[in-house]
């Protein structure tokens, strides 16, 4: 939107005052056409190419400078809570395991000067490493030199340990290279991301910030434009929890903060009346508190859409799992980034995302090379 009135209409949508259809009616049709929301498959890719080609002609775009993206993570992901055992999700029956070939088809057709391909660390070992080797071979075959590194969002100023494989490619003969990144370690704590948000009990919701919250605002949140100049607050709805879960959450938080070693609660540590699962080996680390007093927390996962036991809010007075907005802040999303759909879908969006602070640094480095 190019003026303040249109900008305010987005807030009306976020507040639920107008429908999505009413909002889209106010956006110029030529802009809406540039957003292509279609499933990627062999059956649809030709039509997607045709749509892109039409847009290129209408906007008189000759060359594509850069393509950025990556197939959905789940097909290559280390299994949620079994990450420590390095188990890989079975891929043979998952159609998403071929999506990297779709990505290469875009490279082959549009020949961007550079590209960025992002995925989870598990892609390197999926199918014994064959999928990753094939991907690199296909990229080179269509005319690219490539390099890859496993990068951690924590090194980009994000208050979260989040490892991702980033492949950068450039057309042969262009002289580009894999960017070098300066490590950015913030002195902030994860608490700084949570303190100024309204406190919630299980099942409660807050739809706006308060002046009290503003007084708790931390430098990290202001400096990185996470808190915006608006009272609108979306996605800050706490899940309801059973009395049993609440009691377990309190014990989990207590154990984390009661000693400097920050011990995690193990399932067998619970009294018998709180143990409901027979397979206790699988649930050994089922409950985990977000590390509020540290400079980073564990990786935000799409599994948040299933339950929040692995992401318990560190404030024992709130005794609940984190909200979509809190997860988004840990991912470094600004508060005015609106997640659509039901809460489960929002958690999936947040859990699968690249942290914006990390993405911006990578994008700036790519832009520097393209502008030389």
Please provide the spans of the model-predicted regions.
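C-terminal target-recognition/interaction regions appended to catalytic cores
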Residues: 220-372
